[in-house]
Regions:
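Alpha4 helix (beta4-alpha4-beta5 surface) of REC/receiver domains from two-component response regulators
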Residues: 61, 82-99, 110
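Conserved phosphotransfer cores of two-component systems
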Residues: 41-43, 66-72, 93
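The feature encodes the CheY-like receiver
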Residues: 12, 29, 55, 83
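CheY-like receiver
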Residues: 112, 117-129
Length: 129
């Protein structure tokens, strides 16, 4: 199961539809980090796909608080942010994977399938430097 968090409704719709076509069960969608935490607590999904830059409660808030609920939660961060301070904060919170926006939906699905099929989740595989 998957929850998707992004403040862009078009991205939420696109990802939801594509993931459903790929046989992923999208159990929740939200538009900020607070909704991410609430949806995670309610559904305990296999995957959280979350944007970082969102109004009010950003993805860092969401990631920090999901980590408090479950330090081993599988959280995939989507970011278009080039701010090194923010990127360092994200890395410190140890998301399962960080993908740069724009991220082709096929790449995201490939990452989800790789993680789903691995017996032990890899350490954070960051493409940010």
């Amino acid at each position: 199961s998957v929850i998707i968090i992004d403040d862009d409704e078009d991205i939420l719709e696109l990802l939801s539809e594509y993931l459903l076509l790929e046989d992923f069960d999208v159990v929740g969608r939200g538009t900020d980090g607070l909704q991410a935490v609430n949806l995670y607590a309610k559904h305990t999904p296999d995957f959280v796909i979350m944007d970082i830059a969102m109004p009010t409660y950003d993805g860092i808030y969401g990631l920090e608080n999901i980590r408090k609920l479950n330090p081993n939660a599988t959280v995939i961060i989507l970011t278009g942010n080039s701010d090194k301070t923010i990127n360092q904060k994200i890395i410190q919170l140890n998301p399962t994977r960080i993908l740069e926006k724009p991220c082709p939906v096929e790449k995201l699905v490939s990452v989800l399938k790789t993680i789903k099929n691995s017996t032990s989740y890899p350490d954070t595989m960051s493409i940010l430097s």
